[in-house]
Amino acid sequence: MALRSLFLPNAFPNASSFRGGSRRGAAPRAMPIVMKSNVEVGARNEIAKKPFTPPFEIHEQITHSLPPEKIEIFKSLEGWATDNILIHLRPVEKSWQPQDYLPDPSAESFHDQVKELRQRSKEIPDDYFVALVGDMITEEALPTYQTMLNTLDGVRDETGASLTSWAVWTRAWTAEENRHGDLLNKYLYLTGRVDMRQIEKTIQYLIGSGMDPRTENNPYLGFIYTSFQERATSISHGNTARHAKDYGDLSLAQVCGIIASDEKRHEKAYTKIIEKLFEIDPDATVLAFADMMKKKISMPAHLMYDGRDDNLFKHFSSVAQRLGVYTAKDYADILEFLVERWNVEELTGLSSEGRKAQDYVCTLVPRIRKVDERAQGMAKKGGQTMRFSWIHDREVML
């Protein structure tokens, strides 16, 4: 998934009233477990020196916030998921594989194919490679995303080979996603334009750091997160495909395009899950939607680190924003799409808290667009450059 989302300023209205407390029409949350780090916020340099820890402090982590009766909903939906979610998977024998889009190492013309690929890549600017490498690194952290899905109560793979529809989906989705990082990694390696060792270090750091999507082991929150992220990923890869085409590399455009197509198909599955939850449990679902948007959808790679730059994700996101690969406008567009896709404005019979949550998500898009306008204005005044280790410390504009 590059499961991707932009870093956004903390400028959204507070929705703390959507969390905790009793709710009519929606079961109260289970007593959450709050996990606090023993490292002070701001001690970035000290944290970065410690092995196998994120490059900076993360916030409080809440776990197991879903009441037991809500977990039963997901168990009751296993048959529905078999009929409605697993259909969005492709049989392995009908799936594309990375080798379909790469030079054939068994062919006599292999070296000529590689030379042609490298020649095409020379026409592509460094800032594009920063965006593409960031996407690839995000895809390569797939073990973290499977782990995240298996933290969700009621849908996790309890044995590692469970035959429940939720577990089958998670494993098969992971298997499909695994091709994305493989393909981009090999393609970038063959270009000769990037520092593969620095990229590989970044991947190892990222998988070791994990991710903190703030989904609380709660599948309501988790599937809203994945619905948003899969659409964001499809947009991002679609835009890198468009840029590659503009630069004259039609093969790379095809690579990015086929990945975007996969992400779009996965998005359909996740949005369908939330659609079903809105049908059977609208109050809890709209509360979860507002909760995730209040917390802001963070990119799974927000703990990205290359051993040098503590703010690597922020810098990578700035390049992606400037290039139009993924922007604050896209973030707002995705939210607008999901509000319409799930008919959130039309929900009725909600509790008072549910109506507040409904109003929050339905009026949030214009506020995000204002944030985008300010960000665009700041970008025009910018001119800051940054050296990226991924491209042999060459400078690009942020």
Swiss-Prot record:
Keywords, ordered alphabetically: Chloroplast, Fatty acid biosynthesis, Fatty acid metabolism, Iron, Lipid biosynthesis, Lipid metabolism, Metal-binding, Oxidoreductase, Plastid, Transit peptide
UniProt GO BP: fatty acid biosynthetic process
Entry binding sites for Fe cation 2: E177, E230, E263, H266
EC category name: oxidoreductase
Cofactor field: Fe(2+)
Transmembrane segments: none
Subcellular location: Plastid, Chloroplast stroma
Cross-referenced Pfam families: FA_desaturase_2
Source organism, top-level taxon: Eukaryota
EC number: 1.14.19.11
Catalytic activity: hexadecanoyl-[ACP] + 2 reduced [2Fe-2S]-[ferredoxin] + O2 + 2 H(+) = (4Z)-hexadecenoyl-[ACP] + 2 oxidized [2Fe-2S]-[ferredoxin] + 2 H2O
GO cellular-component term (any): chloroplast stroma
List of residues binding Fe cation 1: E139, E177, H180, E263
Pathway: Lipid metabolism; fatty acid metabolism
UniProt-recorded Gene Ontology molecular function terms: metal ion binding; stearoyl-[ACP] desaturase activity
Cofactor remark: Binds 2 Fe(2+) ions per subunit.
Major localisation: plastid
Range of the transit peptide: 1-29
InterPro entries, per the entry: FADS-2_CS, Fatty_acid_desaturase-2, Ferritin-like_SF, RNR-like
Expression by tissue: Preferentially expressed in the flower labellum. Low expression in leaves.
Subunit composition and interactions: Homodimer.
Function summary: Converts palmitoyl-ACP to (4Z)-hexadec-4-enoyl-ACP by introduction of a cis double bond between carbons 4 and 5 of the acyl chain.
Membership in a protein family: Belongs to the fatty acid desaturase type 2 family.
Protein name (Swiss-Prot/TrEMBL): Palmitoyl-[acyl-carrier-protein] 4-desaturase 3, chloroplastic
Provenance organism: Ophrys sphegodes
Lineage: Eukaryota, Viridiplantae, Streptophyta, Embryophyta, Tracheophyta
Gene assigned in the entry: SAD3
